[in-house]
Amino acid sequence: MEMDTIAAISTALGEGAIGIVRLSGDQAIAIGDKLFKGTKRLEDTPSHTIVYGHLMDDASEEAIEEAMVTVMRAPRTYTREDIVEINCHGGLVSVNRVLQAVLAKGARLAEPGEFTKRAFLNGRIDLSQAEGVIDLIRSKTDRAMNVALRQVEGRLSKKIGKLRQALLETIASIEVNIDYPEYDAETMTAKLINEKMTIVLAEIEALLATAKQGKVLREGLATAIIGRPNVGKSSLMNSLVHEAKAIVTDIPGTTRDTLEEYVNVRGVPLRLIDTAGIRETEDIVERIGVERSRQALKEADLILLVLNYAEKLSKEDEALFEAVKGLDVVVIVNKIDQTGRIDMERVRQLAGENPVVATSFLQEEGVDQLEEAISRLFFAGGVEGADLTYVSNARHIGLLNQAKAHAEEAIAASLTDVPVDLIQIDVTRTWELLGEIIGEDVQDSLIDQLFSQFCLGK
């Protein structure tokens, strides 16, 4: 497949020590040579080496920029094409000057994600690995990064490949039995199909069982902080964020809108939503905030319900317990540095199986216990382990669910008098759906949409 040579800035725009302009394609080295003047031509430079020199302007014969240029020859590169990376001084002017010079010599400005797209089209990575690159870039915690890294390395791809191979062998045996009954091949009976598909189904279900945790690591937990006004919701948010994000006062109704912030709680990314205190109010601005709080409650994955240790439980408190029934909740009894008036026995009764944590955010007490409770609620205290194959991508989850349904159909049919060649339809469809995860037989529009999510230069 012949492609033109592309170029883009690969480092973040802004002031910095170094900026990188990356080229990829058959003419990458030749274009570099049109600009670069050093001790030797780039064409004569061995692969995977760096050379020092200057980028020159043909017209004025003056230097455009001082640079270190890396030459990497196909196929041992990110895209499996020749790659040249020009390392120049950081800064908007210098990096853009180099990019414009490269484009003037014949390179085309790359589209978002086009370098990774070429890695996919040239067979260096499959589609699930490419999606792992996006997750790696967007990781908000070390745990999320480790999971994404395993996907980039191909751990999910290998699992999918193993399942597809087992299905392919089953399909092949069925077809041999039908088309060449005289051959001495294994007879693929309905009973044997049942056994093989049961194994495949168990593997698919095992992958889907990781989806909830995987989604949490990829997208973060939408976490609503709720409670009556002035119980310490904003102080809780500030304790987890470690900065004064919300206004903390003794005046009820201070938080009149929802505030959002991402925080890392023991490897679990939380998208914290500090809601306005839920109460009846005549203040029109505060009332809008209260309505948004109720909406945030409906959309949350985790609820942090804050109570005041220094006050008796109110009807509003009990109504909040009723509102979050059936959801994942951590109950926080705050202000334990003050004289206690709350009925802790009643609190535990209302909390049921949900954890109850006593805190004083003013004195920084109980924060560690709170973080431990959140981590245990979703990861039983930890997510690290030898097997970090988590399914987190919505596209993968959807395809696995479809594959699961067809595997179940094949198993159900194998227990009836349905002919083997009809059972094969569901077996084949299971194989096809798993293939779509790694990029087999996917539409070009899907590929274009996926890579458009990348930043320029990746």
Curated annotation (Swiss-Prot):
Tagged with keyword Aminoacyl-tRNA synthetase: no
UniProt-listed Pfam families: MMR_HSR1, MnmE_helical, TrmE_N
GO molecular function: GTP binding; GTPase activity; metal ion binding
Domain TrmE-type G: 220-379
Record: residues binding GTP: 230-235, 249-255, 274-277
Record's cofactor remark: Binds 1 potassium ion per subunit.
Subcellular location: Cytoplasm
Binding site for Mg(2+): 234, 255
EC number(s) per entry: 3.6.-.-
Family, similarity comment: Belongs to the TRAFAC class TrmE-Era-EngA-EngB-Septin-like GTPase superfamily. TrmE GTPase family.
Record-linked PANTHER family: TRNA MODIFICATION GTPASE GTPBP3, TRNA MODIFICATION GTPASE GTPBP3, MITOCHONDRIAL
Protein's UniProt name: tRNA modification GTPase MnmE
Organism expressing this protein natively: Shouchella clausii (strain KSM-K16)
